[in-house]
Amino acid sequence: MSEAETLFAALRQSANGDVVEMLERMVRDAPDHALNKMNALDLAAREGLAEERVVAALLNAVALGIFEMTWNVMCLSCAGVLSANKSLKTLDRRQYSCAFCAAGYETTLDNLVEVTFTVSPRVRRIAAHSPDGLSVAEYYRQVFWSSAIDLPADLEKVLDEVTLESVDLPPGERAILSLNLPAGTLIVFDPVTHTAQFLDVSGGETNERQNLSVIFNKVQVPVETIALHPGPLRLTLENRTDSRVLPAVWMANQVLDNLLSRRKPILTAKRLLTNQTFRDLYRTDTLAIGQRLKILSLTFLFSDLKGSTELYERVGDLVAFDLVDEHFRLLQEIIVSERGAVVKTIGDAVMATFETPDRAIAAAIRMREAMSDLGAQRQHQSLRLKIGIHEGSCLAVTLNAQQDYFGQTVNIASRVQSLAASRSIVVTKSVVDNAQTQALLASNGLKPALKRVALSGIEDEVSVYEIS
């Protein structure tokens, strides 16, 4: 049995069999580019498999060494990768900028960071493992662009339609290009160093030769648009890096606009942090101590088992422990099935996160029914949950050696839960205002009741809604 066969046999012990079979087939038969920067959501859609099963299988495959995981900071405008990271620990900048789009971005995990998967060279070597050997078109496909852009099969042909001139420039070398500039906006761009120089070619045509020099190095500096006239240009390109660069002169035409507008869903860092398989595998090695990464919108659910002290007194420690343990098992099962993750348990309480408010609401409705059913089955009618939900911004941090969250959103969610009566779900306005939440509540015949309350540590009163 080969090493790959041994690894896939091990993967079958922890992942869905259909997904494992698909991944093994891809590693064996798929073209190189299909095994580089794999988009888990796109892969699930193409193969007709459940997204969460594909994500879980890929995460377990990373743990076994079959695939490698990359956290790519990407430009929201052009979908180019601004920084590729083997771990969230190396996202150490507060802002990233894209020279091609002249745009800057605050580092957030909501939609700026994608997570992709590439086959490990120990299982199969692919061209992307040696990017210096890639053609220009394949460098753009496999290195520069993120998995958020839906690149056409004939990418090389499409790039030809936007490229006035290009060159593969070795380290330390210089090239001189003679061009005849058309009117319009042109971009001298290199995908390796992310260097861009914009040219505004307008006005009357000239017969006199114009001159321009562009230097490529590892330092990105803001550049102003240079005004030129249509006509001849002597363009000097100098590579001052220790690797090849791939500068090209692009025309900002409709073909380029159409290419950049082709998008598909991605596995975001935020979604992965709310994945239970990820937390189970990587909860202690996600962020560096002291590192803080911002999330603009995350939904927190807190639950607490009402009357647990009386339960211990009534049925005894052994029976009560079994009931509480079963309660934790059921809650985690429901949370995971609604695409959430348990962050931690505190006594009889659970703290969980969800990517969107509606998934937290769906989980909460199921959780309280599951507790009623469990209480009835065990003939202990007092198994009732108090649940609170809030959505807002927060920081992903490391606390007590585990990945956790910090901020006012977490505090409010916890305090909202303390307002819940037996079997009630108390949520904040941001949760109820979510369109998917409203549709879910309506489909379940539930009408939230508004009230204004004071929360400890919060200066102003807060609008909360009770779902009975």
Predicted feature residues:
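Cys/His-rich short segments
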Residues: 63-132
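Catalytic/regulatory signature loops of cyclic-dinucleotide turnover enzymes
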Residues: 374, 390, 410-433
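Regulatory cytosolic signal-relay segments
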Residues: 227-230, 236-296
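N-terminal alpha-helical interaction blocks
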Residues: 1-66
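Catalytic core of nucleotidyl cyclases, primarily class III adenylyl/guanylyl cyclases
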Residues: 302-303, 334-362, 373-409
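Cytosolic regulatory/linker segments at or just downstream of nucleotide-handling modules
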Residues: 423-468
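Catalytic NTP-binding/metal-coordinating core of nucleotidyl cyclase/transferase enzymes
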Residues: 284-362
